[in-house]
Amino acid sequence: MAISAKDVMELRKQTDCGMMECKKALTEADGNFEKAIEILRERGLATAAKKASRVAAEGMVYAEYCPKCKVGVVIEVNAETDFVAKNDKFVDFVKEATKVVMLQNPADVEALMACKTEAGETVDEALKNLILVIKENIKIRRFVRYEGVCSAYVHGGGTHGILVNFETTNDIDSKDEFAAYGKDIAMQVAAANPSYVDEASVPAEVVAKEKEIMLAQMAGDPKNANKPDAVKQKMIEGKIKKFFKENCLVDQEFVKDGDLSVAQYTAKVAKDLGGEIKIVKFTRFVKGEGLEKRADDFAAEVASMVK
């Protein structure tokens, strides 16, 4: 059966697949569009399986908060190349996955893949269809979901995603000034990279380890090695305070006003708004952190193709 260019263009429009792929699928399907789409989907699934072993360390991080339902989500979806993050279909998929997490509260990524999207397909099916179009390995790596008052912030077009959870009183979270404050705190987390909310949330073993390191440094320093224990203890107390100031969010210097700590800025905003604000927890995702970056080996790729 002869396949017209018009049919090929129509199938390409429906699937976003390449012209030659569309022509081959239509030929195999004897011109039947539904069958051709099915063939392309099947090939997409096979392609996805082949690509699953390739490193996906690019992509984007996304964060969103729904004030109406008081749920916030931060998610990381990885792809093989950085330009995919600018692809509208990829971005739409990330936002749809975020919405599913927000509304259906899956326990983990595996559970998320089985959830259904607004279109009626599972997230897993939507992902495989996306791989068919984009032709890269794409993976949902991780997500965090908070219930309650939140602030969500995305930096650098998806390089960093921040979600901060608060406790408030007197409905102050509904005010525009609180939204601005929440963004400031999320940006603080993005810029200053704290490890903990406050001193109380630092594990005792972490503090003990820091003290151990400080004592070892003193022992190896001729200026401090022979100082009295009481003096060393005072020095360690000062160093621990510095550790807290650098690593605890509320103790950090506020990036937008160096005269204030984050705790002081929070207290000021709470007073101005007529309520109380407590920073409860936060999550900071950086795209691809901890993942091996893709290193292309053209010779190896060609060799694998001719086997």
Residue map of PLM features:
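N-terminal assembly/interaction segments in proteins that build large macromolecular machines
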Residues: A2-K307
